[in-house]
Regions:
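Single conserved hydrophobic/aromatic residue that forms the stacking wall/gate
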Residues: 1-7, 11
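Short, flexible active-site-proximal loops enriched in glycine and acidic residues
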Residues: 9-15, 49-50, 242
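Residue-level signal for inorganic ion chemistry
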Residues: 16, 39, 97, 128, ...
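Short loop-beta-helix segment that forms the pyridoxal 5′-phosphate
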Residues: 22-31, 130-132
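Phosphate-binding beta-alpha-beta segment of Rossmann-like dinucleotide-binding domains, i.e.
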Residues: 26, 30, 40-59
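Hydrophobic packing residues in well-ordered alpha-helices of helical domains and bundles
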Residues: 28, 32-35, 112, 263
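Rossmann-like NAD(P) dinucleotide-binding subdomain of oxidoreductase/dehydrogenase enzymes
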Residues: 51-194
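ALDH superfamily catalytic-core signature
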Residues: 123, 158-282
Length: 282
């Protein structure tokens, strides 16, 4: 109920697009819907978390499990899907009987703060706590705090390594979902219409490529190379880049000026490589 209410409010205010720069139609609306579905799934699982007895295989023994909340969970979310990933971290933790301290991304804090505001109306005090701020100032004290018994982080590989090291002395469980270099692979027997659309979808062009699951390169069997490349360029040329709040826009904005400069820097590096060609845009 809380997530549905928050999602409705997010949609009305167009907050997800304002928070991230992601296009309303292609990203913000689907993310909002997925957040509701995910919460409903965890709510449905809440009644399944209980102790069970098992037939013993050793005489004169009893085998059983108990529902045992871990305690305080530190959850750190990135800026590229702030509503969905906030829900993905707090919902299972709360369902399992834990309290959560969530640190938002400094670039996109508003969806998480709104979600927290609505959740506070239903949850007991202290169950869900949300802070915003820089990683070194807010994230590190949370990760190293003695009362935090579980850490979950979604973000960059470099920051993930730091978090793992900081949490290691406590021997508390750490869950890391980190970015990577994910290739798309297209073989000559593929259905090219599906494969080409798969490149567009898989590389997350409608999220400006800003996703840890985004394909960062494509391996194409030589005999179909030209067909695939031409097909991808043709589909890309039909995507509309524009104001994220415009329902007609397929592609919104890069999250920040810093990230934009970084993207342009990598494009410049590619252009200086003799074997590289810019086929569209750039």
């Amino acid at each position: 109920h809380c997530t549905s209410s928050a999602a409705s409010d997010v949609y009305k205010r167009q907050l997800l697009s304002l928070d991230t720069g992601n296009a309303l139609r292609t990203q913000a609306v689907p993310e909002t819907a997925a957040s509701i579905e995910l919460t409903n799934m965890f709510a449905g699982l809440s009644g399944e978390l209980k102790g069970e007895n098992y037939p013993p295989n050793i005489p004169n023994t009893i085998h059983y499990t108990t529902r045992d909340p871990i305690g305080v969970v530190c959850a750190i979310v990135p800026w590229n899907a702030p509503l969905f990933l906030t829900v993905a971290k707090i919902a299972p933790a709360i369902v399992a009987g834990n309290s959560v301290v969530l640190k938002t991304a400094e670039q996109a804090p508003f969806c998480a703060l709104l979600l927290s505001e609505i959740f506070q109306q239903e949850l007991p005090p202290g169950v869900l706590n949300v802070i915003s701020g820089l990683g070194e100032e807010c994230g590190e004290p949370l990760v190293t705090h003695e009362k935090v018994r579980k850490v979950t982080f979604t973000g960059s590989f470099s920051v993930g390594k730091i978090i793992a090291k900081k949490a290691a002395p406590k021997l508390c469980p750490v869950t890391l979902e980190l970015g990577g270099k994910n290739p798309n692979i297209i073989m000559s027997d593929a259905d090219l219409d599906i494969a080409i659309q798969g490149v567009i979808d898989g590389m997350r062009y409608t999220r400006q490529g800003q996703a840890c699951t985004a394909g960062s390169r494509v391996y194409i069997q030589e005999k179909i190379y030209d067909k695939v490349i031409n097909g991808v360029v043709e589909k890309l040329s039909k995507l509309k880049m524009g104001n994220a709040l415009d329902e007609g826009s397929d592609i919104g904005a890069i999250i920040s000026e810093e990230q934009l400069k970084r993207t342009l820097h990598y494009m410049d590096i590619a252009k200086q490589t003799s074997s590289a060609k810019v086929l569209h845009g750039g």
